[in-house]
Amino acid sequence: MTKRKMADPDDGLFKPGSKLKHIKTGGFYQVLLLANIEATLEPAYVYESMQSNDFWIRPKTEMEDGRFELISF
């Protein structure tokens, strides 16, 4: 069995501390870290809403597909 590579923050388009704008909603978010989804080991971002302070997790592929715009890092 081949061991899958765990998420490496250097592999992500957005680095921890980056501030993002969601294109569709206009919401602002801060990236906290790059993690792995337990069931699949798929890389995922953990990020926080800068308005509500809610925490979110989104697969790396979705996060980097153009729905978020980098505003600062």
Question: Predicted segment positions?
Answer:
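A short beta-strand micro-motif
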Residues: S18-I23
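Short, surface-exposed beta-strand-loop junctions and turns on beta-sheet-rich folds
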Residues: I37-E38, E64
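Mixed-charge, Lys/Arg-rich low-complexity intrinsically disordered regions
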Residues: M1-P16
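Short beta-strand-centered aromatic/proline hotspots
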Residues: G27-N36
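Intrinsically disordered, low-complexity, charged/polar segments
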Residues: D54-F73
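Short solvent-exposed strand/turn elements
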Residues: A39-R58
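Tryptophan-rich substrate-binding surfaces of secreted polymer-degrading and adhesive proteins
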Residues: K15-P16, P43, Y47, G66-F68
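Pocket-edge structural micro-motifs
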Residues: L33, S49, S72
